[in-house]
Design a protein with these regions (language model features):
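Bacterial Sec-dependent N-terminal signal peptides
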Residues: 1-34
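Membrane-proximal, proline-rich intrinsically disordered regions
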Residues: 25-75, 101, 243-246, 267-268
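Short, well-structured active-site flanking segments
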Residues: 32, 160-171
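Conserved, well-structured interaction surfaces
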Residues: 50, 58-64, 88-163, 179-192, ...
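Short, surface-exposed recognition loops and adjoining beta-strand edges that mediate ligand/DNA contacts
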Residues: 40, 67-88, 169-171, 206-219, ...
């Protein structure tokens, strides 16, 4: 009797398992891990904004990454000038820098290029995502966006002076982005973004000095003076008008420093 009942019930149970099994497994496997963060679900609270801008600052350190034995990436900015020398015979990339025979395969060039566009990419994320975080103190939000603008302009200023025309990327990129493989933009356009970013940072309510090492108003104004000075000469040749812009902006820093020696002491 027991055997007969089992034979009748077993097919019914099997059918139920087959019907319910796929649905149950699918629901189980589709669970969203709550600890996984992506650009789409990360920027939701003010702490995320602070963490995001911190990541941009962190990427600035990559300019000091190693570039082979006894060498760092920053030497790309010094070796080709002819104002320094080295006795490191073991590093062919570094020797090529000093011999002015380096190219896109030289480790220092690769590192500095990647570093510049990591900073730009992270800053673009901050500028695109942080404005949508609510609730958030508007003054803090404005400060963070100003810092991101400065850091992006800093990276582009280095890139345009090193390589001339460079890709001009101002939005977060995905594989679906239309400009995922961007072409090089004219230097004039790159400098326009640099100036626009610095002017926006200048109006972001930054403190004149920040002991924590964050971007300060003094840094923004000083960098803007430097950019104007560069634009006045080669290759843009903006001339006297930009020399005056540079002088006026630098004078703002000097004037404030003289009036507030306890804040900015340029000549201790």
């Amino acid at each position: 009797m027991k055997l007969t009942i089992f034979k009748k019930v077993s097919p019914l149970l099997l059918c139920g398992v087959l019907l319910l099994g796929p649905t149950s497994c699918k629901d189980f496997l589709d669970e969203e891990p709550p600890s996984n963060l992506t650009p789409d679900n990360f920027y939701t609270i003010p702490d995320h904004a602070e963490a995001a801008i911190a990541s941009v600052y962190a990427d600035m350190r990559s300019g000091y990454d190693g570039a082979g034995i006894f060498s760092s990436s920053w030497q790309l900015l010094e070796a080709p000038t002819g104002t320094s020398t080295t006795e490191t015979a073991q590093n062919s990339d570094l020797n090529n820098l000093y011999s002015l025979v380096y190219d896109g395969n030289t480790q220092h060039v690769i590192n500095w290029w990647n570093s510049s566009y990591r900073i730009i990419a992270q800053a673009n994320q901050v500028l695109a995502k942080v404005p949508g975080i609510t609730p958030m103190d508007e003054a803090v939000k404005k400060r963070i966006l100003g810092e991101a603008r400065f850091l992006r302009s800093w990276a582009y200023f280095n890139a345009v002076r090193l390589w001339g025309d460079v890709p001009l990327i101002t939005e977060p990129q995905t594989i679906e982005s239309e400009d995922f493989f961007p072409t090089r933009a004219p230097q004039e356009e790159v400098y326009k973004l640099i100036v626009d970013d610095l002017i926006a940072a200048e109006a972001a309510g930054l403190a004149w000095m920040d002991a924590s090492g964050r971007v300060s108003l003094a840094a923004v104004k000083s960098q803007l003076a430097r950019v104007y000075l560069t634009m006045a000469g080669q290759p843009l040749n903006k001339g006297a008008a930009y020399y005056k812009l540079a002088a006026d902006k630098a004078y703002e820093v000097i004037t404030y420093a003289n009036a507030n020696p306890g804040v900015i002491n340029l000549f201790p």
